[in-house]
From Swiss-Prot:
Function field: Transcriptional regulator of the type VI secretion system.
SMART domains recorded: AAA
Taxonomic superkingdom: Bacteria
Keywords: ATP-binding, DNA-binding, Nucleotide-binding, Transcription, Transcription regulation
Pfam families given in the database record: HTH_8 (PF02954), Sigma54_activat (PF00158)
SUPFAM superfamilies attached to this UniProt entry: Homeodomain-like, P-loop containing nucleoside triphosphate hydrolases
Protein name: Transcriptional regulator VasH
PANTHER family referenced in this protein's UniProt entry, alphabetically: PTS-DEPENDENT DIHYDROXYACETONE KINASE OPERON REGULATORY PROTEIN-RELATED (PTHR32071:SF117), TRANSCRIPTIONAL REGULATORY PROTEIN (PTHR32071)
One GO term describing the cellular component: protein-DNA complex
Length: 530
């Protein structure tokens, strides 16, 4: 068996294309005693020719006709350049440096591969003694060696492309399954975090995303929006769900007790410390620590918390040894922490440590479409707790609730529904009259108005100066209170829209209500914008 056929048998056993290229070039260099050899391959985007060996850091454009490779690609014909002919190919610096070692009796052979087709997949560059290279391409065994490489190269590339497609398909299916699982989790959350508004759907998606990460979560929202529910949901959907969820309200505990609650203490640490007590940080090991109203945490304690977050170690009060705790931190606040940072009331370094994954909860007034679902849920809960059969809310009661701004958000709605259910006979619906008198009148800017006391049969309601009409109204002509209130409200909104030339944003701001609420009232009261 000739040398080249022996070399060919070595190539057949290679199973990786990059290994095949390296071995092919090494065998060529060895068999022809070359000064240099390269296999040039197309880049991933097909715009460049790059060496088979990634350690050789150079490349040529496939359209750069200052080098012979572009001509070979275009013609699919080999090119043989002697030392004298290389003089005319010196404009490209990289090619000039590559061929600088070509001597008087040497030459450069540039061969497109495979040799028997115009479908070029690579270019072979050989540099060495001219007679030896030319003779090799007249040797049948050498040509068979080149053919074996080309066939093996095509086979391995086809197999690798197929494997890549299989992996991409598998990854695509994995992504689809993950997205489907996340959607399922988000849908499951709708039983706890109720609402079909866009804001609530986005919130549930954020919770699922946050749960899948290991980042510290900051839950922001007004009082009554459900911050602890969100924190608990992040824990329940995370990999730590089987470990403890430990919660503490930083605003509900005196400053001098908060540190001992968090860090725990050792016996004798202070007067009354008769035994060791494990702190909440230790209790949360493996699980989640929820710090509610973290904006009320004292500055001195903020520094200690930051150290715990950075080192994952802590020392109980009176303790001499550092202890470790692996916990996920979820914190919440209803205040603007960034303002507190500017006022030097909250540490900036802790602020950035807490805000790795911020989640902002929407106000109830910003998702009026969810009020009916929430109300039905609270009625069902009331029925279960009190063994009653309240049949939901009357549509007028729903309309009444949708006109209210809910400064106390979902918690206030819950209490209103419970109050209404308590006054409703079993088997009937909750009427608007059950809680309407508890709804605070929305403020209206009217500095010229004077206070007017309205007397009704059930109770006296003193209207604020800002919401009373100027002059003395004739209450004797009022026989439908709800209609009178609606007309009064329509007059105020119409006046304000006229004042601002139909600009609903300015009108809503002047009335102290969200633009969405104003739009709802205009639709309900059939108010036309000027």
């Amino acid at each position: 068996m000739s040398q080249w056929l022996a070399f060919a048998t070595q190539l057949v056993g290679v199973r990786k294309s990059h290994q095949l290229a390296l071995q092919f070039v090494d065998l060529l260099t060895q068999g022809l005693d070359l000064s240099d050899s390269l296999l040039l391959l197309p880049s991933s985007d097909g715009r460049l020719l790059v060496p088979h060996d990634p350690q050789r850091q150079f490349a040529w454009s496939v359209t750069d006709f200052d080098v012979p490779f572009a001509h070979v690609l275009q013609s699919s014909n080999a090119m043989h350049l002697t030392a004298e002919e290389l003089v005319f190919w010196q404009s490209n610096r990289t090619f000039s440096q590559l061929t600088s070692r070509v001597g008087m009796f040497d030459s450069v052979w540039i061969q497109p591969l495979p040799m028997d087709t115009r479908q070029v997949h690579s270019i072979l560059l050989l540099m060495g003694e001219s007679h030896g290279i030319v003779s090799a391409f007249e040797n049948a065994d050498f040509l068979k060696f080149i053919e074996v490489f080309s066939q093996q190269w095509s086979l391995l590339n086809d197999m690798e492309r197929e494997e890549q497609r299989r992996l991409e398909l598998k990854q695509s299916l994995t992504d689809i399954e993950r997205d489907s699982a996340q959607r399922s989790l988000a849908n499951a959350l709708s039983r706890t975090l109720i609402g079909e508004s866009a804001a609530m759907q986005k919130l549930r998606e954020q919770i699922v995303s946050a749960a899948n990460s290991q980042l510290s979560v900051m839950v922001q929202g007004e009082t009554g929006t459900g911050k602890e529910l969100v924190a608990a949901a992040v824990h329940e959907l995370s990999s730590r769900k089987s470990a403890p969820f430990v919660a503490i309200n930083c605003a509900a505990i005196p400053e001098h007790l908060l540190e001992s609650e968090l860090f725990g203490y050792c016996k004798g640490a202070f007067s009354g410390a008769d035994s060791d007590k494990q702190g909440l940080i230790a209790q949360a090991n493996g699980g989640t620590l929820f710090l509610d109203e973290i904006g009320d945490m004292p500055l001195t304690l903020q520094a200690k918390l930051l150290r715990v977050l950075e080192s994952r170690t802590f020392r109980p009060l009176g303790g001499k040894q550092e202890l470790s705790s692996d916990f996920r931190l979820v914190s919440a606040t209803h205040v603007n922490l960034l303002d507190q940072v500017r006022k030097k009331e909250f540490r900036q370094d802790l602020y950035y440590r807490l805000f790795q994954y911020p989640i902002t909860l929407p106000r109830l007034a910003a998702r009026l479409e969810d009020i009916e679902l929430l109300s039905e849920h609270f009625v069902r809960v009331f029925n279960l707790q009190h063994n009653t059969r309240i049949r939901g809310l009357n549509y007028r009661a729903i309309d009444c609730l949708k006109q209210y701004d809910f400064p106390g958000n979902v918690r206030e709605l819950k209490h209103l529904i419970e109050f209404g259910c308590a006054q409703t006979a079993d088997g009937t619906q909750v009427e608007a009259s059950c809680f309407a008198h508890r709804l605070q009148t929305l403020p209206c800017l009217a500095p010229e108005a004077t206070p007017v006391a309205v007397s009704v049969e059930t109770e006296n309601v003193d209207l604020e100066p800002s919401v009373a009409l100027a002059g003395e109204p004739n209450f004797a002509v009022i026989h439908d209170l709800k209609q009178a209130v609606s007309q009064f409200e329509a007059l105020i909104i119409s006046e304000r829209l006229n004042r601002f030339a139909g600009d609903r944003a300015k009108a809503a701001k002047s009335l102290g209500i969200p633009k969405r609420t104003l739009a709802y009232k205009c639709l309900k009261l059939e108010i036309k914008t000027p």
